Curated annotation (Swiss-Prot):
Domain OCT: 358-436
Cofactor(s) required, per the database record: Mg(2+)
Free-text function comment from the UniProt entry: An essential GTPase which binds GTP, GDP and possibly (p)ppGpp with moderate affinity, with high nucleotide exchange rates and a fairly low GTP hydrolysis rate. Plays a role in control of the cell cycle, stress response, ribosome biogenesis and in those bacteria that undergo differentiation, in morphogenesis control.
PROSITE patterns: G_OBG, GTP1_OBG, OBG, OCT
Protein name per Swiss-Prot or TrEMBL: GTPase Obg
Gene: obg
Gene Ontology biological-process annotations: ribosome biogenesis
EC number, UniProt record: 3.6.5.-
All copies of domain Obg, residue ranges: 2-160
Domain OBG-type G positions: 161-338
Length: 436
C-alpha cells in the first residue's frame, strides 16, 4: 500500500516580468531616431490543475518548491520580450488550497480539469519608448519587471465520496466496504486498522451506484487531535450521507449506545455542519449471540433520549459476514442520496474568486522604523514594488523614484520622525543618504 499523504505545505513563486529596455533608433537617414526600447514579457503564473488520475498529495512530499519562469527582457525596435509559459502543477480531486500565512481558503478543487492561478506572474517592465514626452523625447529610463507573486500554501486533500462509513475502530467498517464494493482494504482485529481512507463503488440491485469511503476509526477526542485526530475527520466533510456503523455484539465490552453518542460528539465538535448530514445507523455483527438483545436495548435508549419532535434515524440490522440485510441497506442509502443535496464546504464569501496579487489598498503605502545602527528603514508593499521596478543603473530612473517617494509623503514622514540631513535610509539592501 502506498503512503497516503493528505496534507502538504509548499512554496510557489511566479515568474518575474522581464525588464524593459533602453535603446535608441540609429539609422542612416533617421537623424532623430528617438527611443526604441521595448517592454519586457510577462512572468509565468503558477497554475493548479485537477488531475483525476492522482489519488494523494504524495508528489508534494519531496517536491515542495515550484517556480515559474520569468519573462524575457524587452528588445530594440520596440519589440516586447516573450512572455513566460505558465507552470502547471497537477493536484488530485478534492484538494483545498489555503494561504498558509492567513489560513484563508483560496479555492476548493473538485472537478477534473479545474484550474486556479495560485501565484500570478509579474508584468513586464516598460521600455524607454513608453516614457517619451514632448519635454523629454529621448528618455534614458526603463522599468525593471514586476516581481512575481510568492506565497506559502497549505494543501488539504478531502476524499470525494457520496457516503462515509464512521464508527469506532474494529466495528467492521472495512469488512463492510470489502463486501459491498470491489475495494480490498487491509483488515485486522486491532484499533486503527484503517490508517488511510479506502474508497469503493457500490452498485445496488436497481442499478444505482455511489462512492463509499471507509474512514479511519474514531476515538473520543479525535476532534481535538487525539489519536489520529482531525487528519481523518476532514474526509467526512465531502460526504452527503453518513453510515454510522455500530458493533451490536459489544464484543470489546463497550456499550453500543455510548459508542453512538461518542462518535456523534466528535463529529459535532469538529464541524457543526457534519451533523446536518443525514445518518443511517448500521447495526453490524447481528450474527453474534448477544446482538439482538443489544439492538433492542439500543432502540429503547435512542427513543428515550431523542427529541420528540425530531425524526429518529433509520436503523438497519446487518451482518457483513453473512451478508444479512445488505441489499436493503444499500437501497435505502441510494434513496437517501437521491434527495440529499451536496453540502458546500465553504461559503462563497470565505473563498477568493481568484488569488489576490496586488498590494492591500487598506495597508499603509509605507512604514518607517529605525535599526540598531540608527539607519532609517522603509518598508511596505507599494513602496517595495516601486523600488523593485526601478532600474538604478539609469540616473533618470533614480530621479523618478525619488519623485515618487516625495509624492507618497516619505520625505515629510522622515522629517517628522526626526531624520536629519545625511542620515542613512535603507530600502531592502539599498542604502542612500537623506537630503533635507
Amino acid at each position: 500500500m502506498s503512503m497516503f499523504l493528505d496534507t502538504a505545505k509548499i512554496q510557489v513563486k511566479a515568474g518575474n516580468g522581464g525588464d524593459g529596455m533602453v535603446a535608441f533608433r540609429r539609422e542612416k537617414y533617421v537623424p532623430n531616431g528617438g527611443p526604441w526600447g521595448g517592454d519586457g514579457g510577462r512572468g509565468g503564473n503558477v497554475v493548479f490543475v485537477v488531475d483525476e488520475g492522482l489519488r494523494t498529495l504524495m508528489d508534494f512530499r519531496y517536491n515542495r518548491h515550484f517556480k515559474a519562469q520569468s519573462g524575457e527582457k524587452g528588445m530594440t525596435k520596440g519589440m516586447h520580450g516573450r512572455g513566460a509559459e505558465d507552470l502547471i502543477v497537477r493536484v488530485p480531486q478534492g484538494t483545498t488550497v489555503r494561504d498558509a500565512e492567513t489560513g484563508k481558503v483560496l479555492t476548493d478543487l473538485v472537478e477534473n480539469g479545474q484550474e486556479f492561478i495560485v501565484a500570478r506572474g509579474g508584468r513586464g517592465g516598460r521600455g524607454n519608448i513608453r516614457f517619451a514626452t514632448p519635454k523629454n523625447p529621448a528618455p534614458e529610463i526603463s522599468e525593471n519587471g514586476e516581481p512575481g507573486q510568492e506565497r506559502e500554501l497549505l494543501l488539504e486533500l478531502k476524499v470525494l465520496a457520496d457516503v462515509g462509513l464512521v464508527g469506532f475502530p474494529s466495528v467492521g467498517k472495512s469488512t463492510l466496504l470489502s463486501v459491498i464494493t470491489a475495494a480490498k482494504p487491509k483488515i485486522g482485529a486491532y484499533h486503527f486498522t484503517t490508517i488511510v481512507p479506502n474508497l469503493g463503488m457500490v452498485r445496488t440491485q436497481s442499478g444505482e451506484s455511489f462512492a463509499v469511503a471507509d474512514l479511519p476509526g474514531l476515538i473520543e477526542g479525535a476532534s481535538q487531535g487525539v489519536g489520529l485526530g482531525t487528519q481523518f475527520l476532514r474526509h467526512i466533510e465531502r460526504t452527503r450521507v453518513i453510515l454510522h456503523v455500530i458493533d451490536m455484539s459489544a464484543s470489546e465490552g463497550r456499550d453500543p449506545y455510548e459508542d453512538y453518542l461518542a462518535i456523534n460528539k466528535e463529529l459535532e465538535s469538529y464541524n457543526l455542519r457534519l451533523m446536518e448530514r443525514p445518518q443511517i445507523i448500521v447495526a453490524n455483527k447481528m450474527d453474534m449471540p448477544d446482538s439482538a438483545e443489544n439492538l433492542k436495548v439500543f432502540k429503547e435508549k435512542l427513543a428515550a433520549n431523542y427529541d420528540e419532535f425530531a425524526e429518529l434515524p433509520q436503523i438497519f440490522p446487518i451482518s457483513s459476514l453473512t451478508k444479512q440485510g445488505l441489499a436493503t441497506l444499500l437501497d435505502a442509502t441510494a434513496e437517501l442520496l437521491d434527495k440529499t443535496p451536496e453540502f458546500l464546504l465553504y461559503d462563497e464569501s470565505e473563498m477568493e474568486e481568484e488569488a489576490y496579487y496586488g498590494f492591500d489598498e487598506e495597508a499603509p503605502a509605507f512604514e518607517i522604523s529605525r535599526d540598531d545602527d540608527a539607519t532609517w528603514v522603509l518598508s511596505g508593499d507599494k513602496l517595495e514594488k516601486l523600488f523593485n521596478m526601478t532600474n538604478f543603473d539609469r540616473d533618470e530612473a533614480v530621479m523618478k523614484f525619488a519623485r515618487q517617494l516625495r509624492g507618497m509623503g516619505v520625505d515629510e514622514a522622515l522629517r517628522a520622525r526626526g531624520a536629519k540631513d545625511g542620515d542613512l535610509v535603507r530600502i531592502g539592501k539599498f542604502e542612500f543618504e537623506f537630503v533635507d
